[in-house]
Amino acid sequence: REDATYDHIVKYTGFLGGIQVLTILVSVVRNKLAAVLLSTAGVGLSALYQSVIGFLHNTSNLGISFSSIKEIAEYYGENHPEKVLLQVEVVRTWSVWTGLAGMLLCLLFSPAISYWAFGDTSHILPLCLLSPVMGFMAVTVGEISILKAVRRLKRVALISVLGAAATLLLTVPFYYFWGMSGVVPALVVSTLGVMVAHLSLSLPVFPWRVDLLSRAYFRKGWSMVRVGVPYIMATAVNMSVAMGISLFITNWGSLSDVGLYGM
């Protein structure tokens, strides 16, 4: 049994490692195409938007993507399918809640972020238009945590490839036809595509069910939030530093400098 377990670990380590290499290669191609089509200023604008999105998402997510794995995995390991299904519904419900919270944060802080980053309010509308990304990302991380918890590693690996490929295929046309004006729609559409890719592989395992008005789900999810808060605090510090560096470079330099820093 130990030999079989060891072989299983080695097999999937190699498999996931190969998938990771492929994903990195696709990301490199995407970044190179972005640099050619957008110039360093466009890359800098995209990087700045992504740092803001990342900070708001990780702050509003409450660590659900991290803490939810533990409870689902415990029920799955103990062979309690009913409890697994219930917990999956709780995770998905909380993912939607946190996604809506992230959208609200993005809308509320868009004026302040625009002023801090660019010294004026010219980017309020683009930042507001990015608010749906918060919802898409919340659902995405919820689905990947569910698949990890029930050990569907092949699906997790396939999702990584599909997500990278979807981002490449969906962003390049916007960059090619609209240049810097295509940065915001590219981010929205590519994030939507990644979410759809995740759902296409997770829904066959667990059909979509949420209850946004359930008090029971709200109470049951608090255990995940308590576990996730320390994780969120650490992540928020890291993300705030990354966003702060981008904002500093923008204020004291230019978007081209941010693009060069990110590249």
Where would I find each of the regions flagged by the language model?
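Interhelical loop/hinge segments that connect adjacent transmembrane helices in multipass membrane
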Residues: 1-9, 199-242
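Hydrophobic alpha-helical transmembrane segments
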Residues: 124, 128, 157-206, 223, ...
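Interfacial transmembrane-helix starts/ends
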Residues: 9-10, 47, 82-97, 225
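Helix-loop junctions and terminal segments of transmembrane helices
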Residues: 62-78, 149, 206-207
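Alpha-helical transmembrane segments of multi-pass membrane proteins
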Residues: 104, 108, 119-143, 157-161
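Residues that define the loop-to-transmembrane-helix transition and helix capping
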Residues: 41-44, 89, 124, 153-154, ...
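Alpha-helical transmembrane segments of multi-pass membrane transport and lipid-handling proteins
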Residues: 89-118, 168-169, 176
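Signature of the first transmembrane helix
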Residues: 8-69, 94, 103-107, 167-168, ...
